[in-house]
């Protein structure tokens, strides 16, 4: 830029600088020049960053400009993945934020699943308002999900995309493989020999109901278009008893889920698992039983996630710190990591929320906690205490200004 003094025209130049819309023709001719808008923006003194994605959901307001913040975390041109992590201390508003996000996703027609280990009843009114399905998983609950269910899947889209080249796998064998995880949860020190015995008992149980490794055997000849009736844990228990001493330990532990305090898990499924909004409430489960509830919920959700890659879906997990402790922390953590890393390939987003960051990062020196944060492109950081704020600021490389805002 070449500066030219306004000799004998100082008054006119001063008036031009004021917001009076008074332009002096002579000075204007001397000063005008062509400029790119990017260059022009650099001399504009009022600058603020805005986040307004097309087809996004409302997240809040920009504190600096009061403009609305809308984010479309499914926009692959802007975000590497659609995952979201919400961190904050007790009372910072994590659950409220998560609930609002889920309701707005549901309003846009996106499939919503949520696993709530604590205070699941806070979601009940929102679920009922949206016509969703609220499922309380606990001993004595009126809501039942059969662990041995082999559910019908809608493979229409997969057939259209992949045709006959789609990999076909025995549904029975896949379910047996999943139920092996259930046995590892109820019997932490189960041996490989006992797992093989349980595998044999499962095959015999399904065979009693006419179900073999052939997927066509799932269809009920007496009820066209429907699957055969599915066995229950009680039927599996009978097969374990028949096997004898080799299955004694497994049968003894399973008996609690057949006619003991947890016998509600030995009932046919009686909830609508095809709803567009499904909330699993695990609040009434003890620390010992919570891994079983997580297994039941994730077993169903993971099947539905992989059903259709073209359909957007959201899987939310509140109070993740409660999932990463106890005897099943390793199994739960690995399942969480599988969802975080692979859900993008199935058109989905994983939303995780947690307080008590010491517990969140405690297991295996924070391996799972750090991986969950790094695997989420969008992060909500709410009020934290000093120590937690320092840790998060260091982990996420926050500026001092950002770090100051998250301190309570």
Label for each model-derived stretch:
Residues 1-13, 17:
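Conserved ASCE P-loop ATPase motor domains encompassing nucleic-acid-directed helicases/translocases
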Residues 198, 404-407:
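Amphipathic alpha-helical segments of the small helical/lid subdomains adjacent to P-loop NTPase cores
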Residues 4, 67, 74-92, 96-104, ...:
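Conserved P-loop NTPase motor cores
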Residues 13-69, 119-120, 124-132, 137-141, ...:
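P-loop NTPase motor domains
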């Amino acid at each position: 830029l070449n500066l030219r003094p306004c000799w004998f025209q100082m008054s006119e130049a001063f008036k031009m600088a004021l917001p009076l819309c008074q332009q002096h023709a002579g000075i204007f001719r001397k000063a005008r020049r062509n400029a790119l808008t990017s260059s022009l923006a650099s001399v504009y003194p009022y600058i603020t960053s805005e986040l307004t994605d097309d087809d996004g959901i409302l997240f809040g307001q920009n504190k600096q400009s009061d403009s609305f913040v809308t984010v479309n975390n499914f926009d692959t041109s802007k975000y590497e993945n659609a995952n979201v992590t919400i961190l904050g201390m007790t009372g910072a508003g994590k659950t409220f934020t998560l609930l609002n996000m889920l309701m707005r996703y549901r309003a846009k027609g996106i499939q919503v699943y949520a696993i709530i280990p604590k205070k699941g009843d806070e979601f009940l009114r929102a679920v009922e308002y949206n016509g969703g399905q609220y499922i309380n998983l606990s001993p004595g609950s009126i809501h039942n999900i059969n662990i041995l269910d082999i559910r019908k899947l809608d493979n229409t889209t997969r057939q259209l995309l992949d045709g006959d080249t789609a990999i076909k796998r025995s549904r029975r064998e896949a379910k047996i493989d999943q139920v092996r995880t259930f046995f590892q949860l109820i019997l932490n020190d189960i041996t490989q020999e006992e797992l093989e015995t349980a595998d044999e008992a499962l095959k015999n149980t399904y065979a009693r109901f006419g179900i073999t490794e052939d997927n066509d055997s799932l269809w009920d000849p007496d009820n066209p278009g429907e699957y055969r009736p599915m066995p229950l844990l009680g039927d599996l228990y009978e097969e374990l008893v028949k096997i004898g001493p080799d299955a004694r330990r497994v049968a003894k532990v399973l008996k609690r889920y057949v006619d003991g305090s947890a016998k509600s898990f030995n009932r046919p499924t009686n909830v609508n698992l095809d709803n567009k909004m499904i909330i699993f409430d695990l609040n009434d489960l003890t620390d010992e039983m919570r891994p079983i509830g997580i297994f039941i919920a994730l077993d169903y959700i993971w099947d539905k996630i992989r059903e259709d890659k073209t359909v957007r879906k959201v899987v939310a997990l509140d109070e993740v710190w409660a999932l990463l402790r106890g005897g099943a922390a390793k199994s739960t953590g690995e399942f969480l990591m599988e969802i975080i890393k692979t859900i993008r390939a199935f058109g989905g987003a994983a939303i995780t929320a947690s307080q008590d960051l010491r517990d969140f990062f405690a297991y295996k020196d924070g391996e799972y906690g750090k991986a969950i944060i790094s695997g989420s492109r969008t992060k909500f950081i709410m009020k934290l205490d000093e120590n937690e704020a320092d840790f998060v600021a260091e982990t996420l490389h926050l500026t001092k200004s950002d770090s100051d805002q998250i301190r309570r």
